[in-house]
């Protein structure tokens, strides 16, 4: 009940006792109404003099960017800019998805004019743009101890970016590379490490590259060529459609898809390539290609804000604007599930000269472990497995390299086995 309601109830009791005392002509009953009348009068005077506390809120964070699952230290400073506050209670309003790991989010104190109080706590945040909206402030009146509550807005935002797993080696061979030196084999002769071919000696060739064994056989000067290594254009494509990212309870395939996108982007940027990010879901979120740490920060910020969506216009991959991607470049796509229409679109991309790596997070083992054994479960598992084999076979026929990632294991070790030079030779 609000303070005015309480005072009204007390006045009603006092008036009722007074009327009853007059009717029964009993002074004791009439006198019993006096304490209630005095309390109600004092409360009314106290309410008329009560003012909202004049306080300011300052919040300090140990970092404005963290990796999901890490902790962040928060310090809240409350300063009294008005008259003395005898009793003041402050409680931080913490959203449900943030986990408090240590410290206190509330405090109680008496504040003189110009004084301040401080409390600190530590929280853990999942991936995304997170905000602390403000604090709930409670004061009590001096005489009646009636509480007055108000919310003081003071929003502080921070970003929890996805985990980027370190990857050792990925061998890509796009049809087109840039002119600058890098680590991607360009399928062109020149200066490099790996042997590429030979040609007849011409004026200006480096004599240290003359193949003397060939000269001994042919009596003609033959020069060795080595394969050039350059940087490449790489686009990380994150499929954020609802139907492509199934969930199992609180576990979401999309969480692992975002981590895979961050890991792949980090690797290719570290190798000096030009990397862009395209998120296909609620809308087309395009991060223009770039280089270096600043580009990695932009990509992580976009991935931190990424969410799944179910929009009819983006139901399949036909709406993908391929003109955004550099011609005949490398595409790294991450999707939890594909259908026949998606495979058809990927075939068109391959026909246009794009090299495609498809990473598919797989939570099937986790899901099967949560379902009790039955004939229905075994039949459903068989159907899902057969359908997946059909999709994977169709992708292999059009030349898409598929990495089927069981999320219970490490992505880095799987990529090192399937996409590295050594792994491909052994395969």
Regions found by a protein language model. Give the residues of each.
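Extracellular/lumenal glycan-associated context and N-glycosylation machinery
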Residues: 1-58
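An amphipathic, basic-hydrophobic helix/alpha-beta surface used to engage anionic
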Residues: 37-294, 330-334, 340, 348, ...
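A short, conserved beta-to-alpha structural element at the edge of catalytic cores
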Residues: 264-273, 360-370
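Short beta-alpha junction loops
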Residues: 281-284, 361-366, 408
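Von Willebrand factor
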Residues: 292-328
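Acidic, Ser/Thr-rich peripheral helices and adjacent loops at domain boundaries
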Residues: 297-304, 359-361, 368-394
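Exposed acidic/Ser/Thr-rich ligand/metal-binding surfaces
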Residues: 314-360
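C-terminal helix of von Willebrand factor
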Residues: 383-426
């Amino acid at each position: 009940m609000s303070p005015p309601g309480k005072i009204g109830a007390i006045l009603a009791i006092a008036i009722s006792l007074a009327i009853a005392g007059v009717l029964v002509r009993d002074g004791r009953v009439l006198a019993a109404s006096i304490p209630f009348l005095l309390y109600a009068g004092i409360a009314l005077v106290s309410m008329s003099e009560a003012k909202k506390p004049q306080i300011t809120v300052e919040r300090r964070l140990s970092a404005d960017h963290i990796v999901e699952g890490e902790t962040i230290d928060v310090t809240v400073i409350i300063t009294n800019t008005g008259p003395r506050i005898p009793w003041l209670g402050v409680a931080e309003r913490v959203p449900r998805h943030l986990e408090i790991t240590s410290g206190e989010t509330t405090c109680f104190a008496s504040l003189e004019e110009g004084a301040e109080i401080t409390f600190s706590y530590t929280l853990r945040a999942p991936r995304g743009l997170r905000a602390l909206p403000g604090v709930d402030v409670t004061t009590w009146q001096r005489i009646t101890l009636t509480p007055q509550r108000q919310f003081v807005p003071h929003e502080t935002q921070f970003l929890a970016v996805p985990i980027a797993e370190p990857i050792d080696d990925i061998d890509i061979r796009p049809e087109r590379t840039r002119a600058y030196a890098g680590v991607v084999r360009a399928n062109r002769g020149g200066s490099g490490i790996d042997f590429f071919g030979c040609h007849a000696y011409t004026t200006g060739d480096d004599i240290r590259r003359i193949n003397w064994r060939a000269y001994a056989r042919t009596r003609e000067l033959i020069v060795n060529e080595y394969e050039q290594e350059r940087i490449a254009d790489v686009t990380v494509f994150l499929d954020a459609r609802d139907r492509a990212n199934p969930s199992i309870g609180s576990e979401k395939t999309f969480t692992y898809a975002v981590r895979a996108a961050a890991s792949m982007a980090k690797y290719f940027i570290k190798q000096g390539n030009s990397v862009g990010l395209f998120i296909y879901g609620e809308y087309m979120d395009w991060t223009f290609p770039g280089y270096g740490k600043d580009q990695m920060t932009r990509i992580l910020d976009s991935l931190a804000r990424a969410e799944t969506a179910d929009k009819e216009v983006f139901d399949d991959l036909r709406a993908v604007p391929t003109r955004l991607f550099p011609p005949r470049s490398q595409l790294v796509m991450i999707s939890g599930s594909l259908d026949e229409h998606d495979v058809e679109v990927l075939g068109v991309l391959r026909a246009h000269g794009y090299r495609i790596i498809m990473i598919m997070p797989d939570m099937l083992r986790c899901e099967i472990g949560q379902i009790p054994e039955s004939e229905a479960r075994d039949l459903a598992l068989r159907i899902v497995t057969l359908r997946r084999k059909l999709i994977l076979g169709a992708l292999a026929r059009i030349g898409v390299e598929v990495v089927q990632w069981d999320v219970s294991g490490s992505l880095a070790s799987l990529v090192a086995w399937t996409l590295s030079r050594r792994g491909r030779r052994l395969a």
